[in-house]
């Protein structure tokens, strides 16, 4: 490239200064690159005329920023301006005079081009066939610069509500000249692209804010010479702050020219900010081999970084990576450099905060050594370090690097990796996430905290020495992850703690989605506000997973100790975990073994959690199914149940049996319990209706004369059913209306009538709930013979509607409905012993039966219930006793008492998912009742009674019957 000295005549300089000052003050447009054309002679690129040449052909530059604008083109502030081309702060940055503000402020402006701290330049023929740079020029003035580095004189660049788009990539112009009398023209291109929007080689503080957009930033370590600097008190410091803004990649090529093979899309050319994938850099940091370390800190808040971040470091010139002998004894004893190790190390610390997002790769190019004499390690190598002898055995992974690259994501920020990213440390905090798909990520350590996530998708690969999943964070490997020859997650140690989750949701027969030597499921030493110690979770979902690693938990069962807690192994019921251990023996020559290896495949205490729930599946699908196998008879690990899971009709939990863990069958699920309890609950409603009809007939034989009539009764009750399999609580409320008449027949007086009953039931147990509706039609009769023997009989038809709902163990709502029809009968016989004119004692016996026929139905969770013929018989022997108090011809009060033995015979079972399950309710019980009937007039009376029945599978805690009748 040619050196090009910018010489201007006094009149031109004065004019330029005046125009620049005026344009900046009035927010105008201006160009930094122009072409001065002599229309007679042709431009000769290799011998271009000097700027200011009268009648010359030359490219002219007018874009320097000075502290004192009388010296040049621009002052230090742009507001509302539009700039086309390159802005150079070279003379501003090299003016170290006292009270000189080394600062450039750009607000509310558009820079079509770039800002550089270097001398501006361009190429008229950038590359040859081999890609080598060819002809070009750089531009400078007569201004004197200080060539010494002044540490602390940091250039501040403030960019607010401004776009710097790196989109001025070339000066296009037409050169006119005479060929004889003929005027000819050539189209020329002067390539001025910087590759990024901001290109600085001075210590810099860059502040980008207020919806700004910058197409790339490149910071390099420029001149560090100052003969007065002889101590280690100096570092080259760069700071970038991006708030509410976007930094994208730039371009080294002319994107709107077909010369570089670029094509448009419907007339729209590419833009420098269009991220083209790995290799398209948005930020680069390049340290030189000076004596001083380069420290770079980048902070983004609510901002977007679209492009790669490249970090290049080499050894300081005073550091010896191989070591040397400092005292002449023939033994290497020092690496030189500064005493403070950190001053021998370049740094790039990139922090994304407040919902910021980065799409791109971390490009990492540093030097490293394992020959450490008087420096401490500062990084790990993804490979290994070896013995310095003929054996060359693996001894370590610790190295000393010339630079370290650390990435932190905070408060809901996101990094979508591309290409192959390498960093030293990666911390992901407070709901942030890293997504690795079709790319690779390597970091010495990866730490996730406070609900953050690392998602490894299709063709994503993550490599680290130690992965820590803390405080409800998640590392997820999903079915979309493509398995190849490499493991998609490789970590020497994985620690999952405090509710963190290693989530391996892969295809059922993927055996090694990740590889590790040690999987540690542990917990913190502090209990939550409920007194629980929250542990780490290893969740394999439905995978048939083989863990070729040691499973470790350092907790104890002793709740009085600070390390109380269990590791959690989670899976679905169709999953299976085989724990093989890492296969190591106590081999002290290997880094990953020696004293830290547990030898046995699993140690510690674990809870096993079954996460799925379903109504489908027979008992044989789940009962005693092996879900964990520890392939080590010496293992002392314990496994116990973390929960119960609804699987088919039953709940199941984990149970350890030796070195296996199986599904242990427990009680019915809430939804199965409700489904199987419905026939019994229907019977309870019908029994209340049967008792209501029975009360009507009993009352017709006592008190004032009853010639038949119309009656209406409320009935209700509460039931508790428990046969050892089903269990429920039921409330019933209903009403019956009837009409009957008295008929004198042969040797008996008859009451013949009909009734209709309507009832609602509410059955529940735990989360199970059934809403019941019942409609019943009755015909009934009673014959009272002259010898005081009586016989009561009834026939009925009932229809039951039942709507079922429940919540499964995984929180899923389930519902279903079923209808059934039933026929019933009742037969009662007894003898009235008269005690004087008013009292009576009536021994009796009765038998009743209800025969239900239900339909097949399926719940929303796929549990299938076959239609059931449910038969229920009740046998009762008892005695009634009462006394009538007559107050007048039309008024009387009859209180009465009932005591009976009841036997329910309901030996039934129902098919659920193909399994026969007992849902019959039977057994002996005692009935105790009290009641009264009061006649207000000859024709109008009221009655009430209450009963308790208990002792069988179904206890009737109470029932009540309140009614009125009108006698003909």
From Swiss-Prot:
<dbReference type="InterPro" id="IPR005546">
    <property type="entry name" value="Autotransporte_beta"/>
</dbReference>
<dbReference type="GO" id="GO:0019867">
    <property type="term" value="C:outer membrane"/>
</dbReference>
<protein>
    <recommendedName>
        <fullName>Putative uncharacterized protein YaiT</fullName>
    </recommendedName>
</protein>
<dbReference type="InterPro" id="IPR004899">
    <property type="entry name" value="Pertactin_central"/>
</dbReference>
<keyword id="KW-0732">Signal</keyword>
<dbReference type="InterPro" id="IPR036709">
    <property type="entry name" value="Autotransporte_beta_dom_sf"/>
</dbReference>
<dbReference type="InterPro" id="IPR051551">
    <property type="entry name" value="Autotransporter_adhesion"/>
</dbReference>
<dbReference type="Pfam" id="PF03212">
    <property type="entry name" value="Pertactin"/>
</dbReference>
<feature type="signal peptide">
    <location>
        <begin position="1"/>
        <end position="27"/>
    </location>
</feature>
<dbReference type="InterPro" id="IPR003991">
    <property type="entry name" value="Pertactin_virulence_factor"/>
</dbReference>
<feature type="domain" description="Autotransporter">
    <location>
        <begin position="703"/>
        <end position="968"/>
    </location>
</feature>
<dbReference type="InterPro" id="IPR011050">
    <property type="entry name" value="Pectin_lyase_fold/virulence"/>
</dbReference>
<dbReference type="Pfam" id="PF03797">
    <property type="entry name" value="Autotransporter"/>
</dbReference>
<dbReference type="InterPro" id="IPR006315">
    <property type="entry name" value="OM_autotransptr_brl_dom"/>
</dbReference>
């Amino acid at each position: 490239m040619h050196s090009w000295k910018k010489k201007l005549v006094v009149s031109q300089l004065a004019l330029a200064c005046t125009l620049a000052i005026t344009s900046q003050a009035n927010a105008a447009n201006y160009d930094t690159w122009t072409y001065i054309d002599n229309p007679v002679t042709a431009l000769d690129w290799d011998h271009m005329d000097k700027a200011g040449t009268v009648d010359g052909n030359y490219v002219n530059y007018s874009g320097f920023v000075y502290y004192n604008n009388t010296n040049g083109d621009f002052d230090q502030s742009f507001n509302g301006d539009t700039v086309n081309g390159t802005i150079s702060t070279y003379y501003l940055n090299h003016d170290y005079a006292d009270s000189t503000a080394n600062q450039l402020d750009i607000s509310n402006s558009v820079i079509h081009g770039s800002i550089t701290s270097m001398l501006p330049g361009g190429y008229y023929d950038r590359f040859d066939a081999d890609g080598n740079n060819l002809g070009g020029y750089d531009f400078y003035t007569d201004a004197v610069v200080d060539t010494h580095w002044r540490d602390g004189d940091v250039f501040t660049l403030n960019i607010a509500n401004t776009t710097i788009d790196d989109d001025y990539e070339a000066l296009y112009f037409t050169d006119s000249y005479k060929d004889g009398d003929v005027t000819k023209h050539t189209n020329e291109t002067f390539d001025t692209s910087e590759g990024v929007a901001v290109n600085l080689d001075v210590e810099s503080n860059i502040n980008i804010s207020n919806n700004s957009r910058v197409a790339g930033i490149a910071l390099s370590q420029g001149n560090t010479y100052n003969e007065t600097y002889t101590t280690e008190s100096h570092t080259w410091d760069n700071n970038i702050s991006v708030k509410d803004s976007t930094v994208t990649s730039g371009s080294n090529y002319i994107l709107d020219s077909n010369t570089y093979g670029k094509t448009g899309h419907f007339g729209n050319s590419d833009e420098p900010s269009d991220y083209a994938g790995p290799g398209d850099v948005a930020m680069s940091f390049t340290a030189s081999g000076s004596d001083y370390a380069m420290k770079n800190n980048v902070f983004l808040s609510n901002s977007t970084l679209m492009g790669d971040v490249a970090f290049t470091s080499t050894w300081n010139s005073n550091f010896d990576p191989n070591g040397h002998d400092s005292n002449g004894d023939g033994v290497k004893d020092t690496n030189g450099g500064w005493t403070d190790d950190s001053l021998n190390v370049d740094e790039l610390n990139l922090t994304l905060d407040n919902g910021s997002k980065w799409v791109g790769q971390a490009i990492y190019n540093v030097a490293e050594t394992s020959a450490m004499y008087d420096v401490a390690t500062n990084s790990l190598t993804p490979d290994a370090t070896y013995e310095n002898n003929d054996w060359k055995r693996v001894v370590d992974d610790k190295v000393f690097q010339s630079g370290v690259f650390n990435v932190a994501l905070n408060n809901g920020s996101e990094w979508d990796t591309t290409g192959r990213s390498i960093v030293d440390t990666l911390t992901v905090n407070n709901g942030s996430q890293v997504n690795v798909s079709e790319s690779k990520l390597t970091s010495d350590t990866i730490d996730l905290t406070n609900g953050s996530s690392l998602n490894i998708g299709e063709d994503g690969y993550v490599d680290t020495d130690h992965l820590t999943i803390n405080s409800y964070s998640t590392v997820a490997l999903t079915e979309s992850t493509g398995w190849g020859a490499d493991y998609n997650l490789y970590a020497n140690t994985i620690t999952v703690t405090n509710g963190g989750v290693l989530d391996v949701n892969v295809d059922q027969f993927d055996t090694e989605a990740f590889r590790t030597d040690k999987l540690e499921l542990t917990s913190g030493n502090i209990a939550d506000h409920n007194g629980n110690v929250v542990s780490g979770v290893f969740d394999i979902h439905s995978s048939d997973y083989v863990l070729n690693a040691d499973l470790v938990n350092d907790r104890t069962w002793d709740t009085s100790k600070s390390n109380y807690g269990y590791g959690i192994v989670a899976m679905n019921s169709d999953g299976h975990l085989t724990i093989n251990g890492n296969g190591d023996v106590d081999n002290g020559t290997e880094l990953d073994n020696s004293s830290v290896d547990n030898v046995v495949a699993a140690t510690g205490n674990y809870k096993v959690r079954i996460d799925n729930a379903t109504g489908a599946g027979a008992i044989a699908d789940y009962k005693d199914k092996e879900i964990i196998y520890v392939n080590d008879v010496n293992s002392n690990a314990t496994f116990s149940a973390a929960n119960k899971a609804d699987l088919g009709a039953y709940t199941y939990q984990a149970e350890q049996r030796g070195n296996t863990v199986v599904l242990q069958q427990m009680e019915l699920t809430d939804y199965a319990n409700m489904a199987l309890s419905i026939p019994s609950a229907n019977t309870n409603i019908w029994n209340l209706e049967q008792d209501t009809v029975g009360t009507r007939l009993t009352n017709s034989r006592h008190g004032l004369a009853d010639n038949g009539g119309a009656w209406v009764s409320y009935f209700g009750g509460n039931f508790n059913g428990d046969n050892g399999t089903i269990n429920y609580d039921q409330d019933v409320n209903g009403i019956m209306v009837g009409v009957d008449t008295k008929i004198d027949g042969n040797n008996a007086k008859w009451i013949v009538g009909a009734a209709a009953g309507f009832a609602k039931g509410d059955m529940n147990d735990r989360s199970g709930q059934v809403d019941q509706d019942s409609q019943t039609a009755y015909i009934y009769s009673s014959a009272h013979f002259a010898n005081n023997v009586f016989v009561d009989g009834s026939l009925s038809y009932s229809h039951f509607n039942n709507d079922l709902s429940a919540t499964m163990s995984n929180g899923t709502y389930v519902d279903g409905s079923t209808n059934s029809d039933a026929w019933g009968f009742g037969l009662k016989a007894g003898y009235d012993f008269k005690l004087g004119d008013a009292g009576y004692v009536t021994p009796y016996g009765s038998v009743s039966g209800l025969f239900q026929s239900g339909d097949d139905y399926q719940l929303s969770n796929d549990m299938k219930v076959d239609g059931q013929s449910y038969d229920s018989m009740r046998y009762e022997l008892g005695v009634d006793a009462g006394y009538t108090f007559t107050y007048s011809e039309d008024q009387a009060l009859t209180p009465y008492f009932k005591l009976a033995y009841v036997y329910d015979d309901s030996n039934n079972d129902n098919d659920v998912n193909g399994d026969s399950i007992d849902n019959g309710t039977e057994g002996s019980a005692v009935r105790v009742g009290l009641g009264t009937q009061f006649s207000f007039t000859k024709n109008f009376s009221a009655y009430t009674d209450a009963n308790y029945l208990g002792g069988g599978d179904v206890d009737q805690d109470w029932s009540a019957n309140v009614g009125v009748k009108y006698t003909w």
